[in-house]
Amino acid sequence: MIDDDGYRPNVGIVICNRQGQVMWARRFGQHSWQFPQGGINPGESAEQAMYRELFEEVGLSRKDVRILASTRNWLRYKLPKRLVRWDTKPVCIGQKQKWFLLQLMSADAEINMQTSSTPEFDGWRWVSYWYPVRQVVSFKRDVYRRVMKEFASVVMALQDNPPKLQSAPAYRRKRG
């Protein structure tokens, strides 16, 4: 589903822990890292797509997280011309995204990157809050900066009043 401007509707997911760290996932078979994200299907709300993508990409369900915030507006990024599939119709030139900030309420061990026959990620780790802005692929950097700026006060407030969660190691490889 591509809009009239050539953008694919999409959700992005920032998962944080009680220390204010965020989950950073390594793309399957690659050296690039990013937050979970995925397309919104026809007839699906952004929140429904977020829960579907959350399960497909990291094996978490509604019971494992709580929604802390979502971006006020849709955020867009353009794909580099070399990544645009010019032979498809309609042509998708980028993504327009609604972002969600989630707090992990379950143990880290619940994260499972192997729920799909074609996994998006093969590893993950907790990183400092601003780390992804510097590390994400360049064409997504402005969107990441805007998302993290919008969610910063919510995440920082968690550190002042953290809920009790089970502790677990800071880095996990794929489960399965």
UniProtKB/Swiss-Prot annotation:
It is an enzyme of class 3 (hydrolase). CDD domains: NUDIX_Ap4A_hydrolase_plant_like. Its EC number is 3.6.1.-. InterPro entries: Nudix_hydrolase (IPR020476), NUDIX_hydrolase-like_dom_sf (IPR015797), NUDIX_hydrolase_CS (IPR020084), NUDIX_hydrolase_dom (IPR000086), RppH (IPR022927). GO terms for biological process: mRNA catabolic process. PROSITE patterns: NUDIX, NUDIX_BOX. A motif (Nudix box) lies at residues 38-59. Its cofactor is a divalent metal cation. GO terms for cellular component: cytoplasm. Keywords: Hydrolase. Residues 6-149 form the Nudix hydrolase domain. It comes from the Bacteria. Pfam families: NUDIX (PF00293). One of its GO terms (molecular function) is mRNA 5'-diphosphatase activity. PANTHER family: M7GPPPN-MRNA HYDROLASE (PTHR23114:SF17). Belongs to the Nudix hydrolase family. RppH subfamily. Accelerates the degradation of transcripts by removing pyrophosphate from the 5'-end of triphosphorylated RNA, leading to a more labile monophosphorylated state that can stimulate subsequent ribonuclease cleavage. This is RNA pyrophosphohydrolase. It comes from Salmonella typhimurium (strain LT2 / SGSC1412 / ATCC 700720). The lineage of its organism: Bacteria, Pseudomonadati, Pseudomonadota, Gammaproteobacteria, Enterobacterales. The gene is rppH.
